[in-house]
Amino acid sequence: MVRKVLMICLGNICRSPIAEVVMVDTLEKANVKDVEVDSAAIGGWHVGNRADPRAISTLQKHGLKCTHIVRQIRKQDFSEFDYIFGMDEDNMSELRRLAPKGSKAELLMLGDFGLEKKNRIIEDPYYERGAEGFETAYQQCVVACAAFMKERLQK
């Protein structure tokens, strides 16, 4: 049975593409099969573009490649995916608002896995934090993706 994971952030150019690539890498290194991972945006501003160059650069620094093209979340994602992750409380509120009644997808905050409560929000590095913020988001994703995999996907 294939399980499907969708990473969500506001614009799908910073946090969610990093989380997508990190989750794929985490699963490959653990030899976990039958899991598909994608990412998408809450908003449609960047649809059709690539991830932020700082996100791509951060991933490259860790030997990872990002070829993702931005897309916006769709209603059918809530029935096609098993797990949909937000990066912060605003993402989670929007996901709950957008989710059709009776949706199959479990809505989760990525930082609730493996991170201390005070560090569970994966902050948007787009405006405030330069390259350092992207590295912080990457490191949070590494911890959270590994913890989620161990808790939910390696059973």
UniProtKB/Swiss-Prot annotation:
Keywords: Cytoplasm, Hydrolase, Protein phosphatase. InterPro entries: LMW_PTPase, Ptyr_pPase, Ptyr_pPase_sf, Tyr_Pase_low_mol_wt_mml, Tyr_phospatase_low_mol_wt. It catalyses: O-phospho-L-tyrosyl-[protein] + H2O = L-tyrosyl-[protein] + phosphate; a phosphate monoester + H2O = an alcohol + phosphate. It is found in: Cytoplasm. GO terms for molecular function: acid phosphatase activity; non-membrane spanning protein tyrosine phosphatase activity; protein tyrosine phosphatase activity. Cone cells and primary pigment cells in developing pupal retina. Coiled coil: none annotated. GO terms for cellular component: cytoplasm; nucleus. SUPFAM superfamilies: Phosphotyrosine protein phosphatases I. The active site is at residues 9, 15, 124. Its main location: cytoplasm. The keyword DNA repair does not apply. Its EC number is 3.1.3.48, 3.1.3.2. Pfam families: LMWPc. It is an enzyme of class 3 (hydrolase). Belongs to the low molecular weight phosphotyrosine protein phosphatase family. PANTHER family: LOW MOLECULAR WEIGHT PHOSPHOTYROSINE PROTEIN PHOSPHATASE, LOW MOLECULAR WEIGHT PROTEIN TYROSINE PHOSPHATASE. Acts on tyrosine phosphorylated proteins, low-MW aryl phosphates and natural and synthetic acyl phosphates. This is Low molecular weight phosphotyrosine protein phosphatase 1.
